[in-house]
Each structure stands twice: as C-alpha cells, then as structure tokens.
Amino acid sequence: MELALQITLIVTSVLVVLLVLLHRAKGGGLSTLFGGGVQSSLSGSTVVEKNLDRLTLFVTGIWLVSIIGVALLIKYR
C-alpha cells in the first residue's frame, strides 16, 4: 500500500509539473520576464485548453489524495 502511494505520488508530481508547463500564459506574472507576455491573435479558451484545465485539476486531486495518504501512513506507522 505504501509503495503504491509513493509511486502514485511521484507519477502525479511529474504529471502536474508537465501539465502546468503546457498551459498558455494568460498575461502578467513571471511569464512576462521570459518573453511570455506576447498576446496571441486568438482570444478565449479553446476546447483543448479547457480539457487541459480539467486534466490538470483531476491529476492535482489525485496528487492531493496521495499526499494525504502518505502522511497518514507515516503518522500511524
């Protein structure tokens, strides 16, 4: 059980980082320091962006549950 939670935690951590990096910068913030402040000609969210948002939230939820699971296993070991 502990090994499965740790593997899930590692996989979801990597996925969250990759999914966040795939998001398009929406202006402002630190992305403008690195040239990310350029506006595109297409405004609004596409279906791909909405699905990417949903997938990011889903993977983040799994990540959060695995963090809590590992913490509980450590506490009640």
Curated annotation (Swiss-Prot):
<keyword id="KW-0653">Protein transport</keyword>
<dbReference type="GO" id="GO:0009306">
    <property type="term" value="P:protein secretion"/>
</dbReference>
<keyword id="KW-1133">Transmembrane helix</keyword>
<keyword id="KW-0811">Translocation</keyword>
<keyword id="KW-1003">Cell membrane</keyword>
<protein>
    <recommendedName>
        <fullName>Probable protein-export membrane protein SecG</fullName>
    </recommendedName>
</protein>
<keyword id="KW-0472">Membrane</keyword>
<dbReference type="Pfam" id="PF03840">
    <property type="entry name" value="SecG"/>
</dbReference>
<comment type="function">
    <text>Involved in protein export. Participates in an early event of protein translocation.</text>
</comment>
<keyword id="KW-0813">Transport</keyword>
<dbReference type="InterPro" id="IPR004692">
    <property type="entry name" value="SecG"/>
</dbReference>
<keyword id="KW-0812">Transmembrane</keyword>
<feature type="transmembrane region" description="Helical">
    <location>
        <begin position="3"/>
        <end position="23"/>
    </location>
</feature>
<dbReference type="GO" id="GO:0015450">
    <property type="term" value="F:protein-transporting ATPase activity"/>
</dbReference>
<feature type="transmembrane region" description="Helical">
    <location>
        <begin position="55"/>
        <end position="75"/>
    </location>
</feature>
<dbReference type="GO" id="GO:0005886">
    <property type="term" value="C:plasma membrane"/>
</dbReference>
<comment type="similarity">
    <text>Belongs to the SecG family.</text>
</comment>
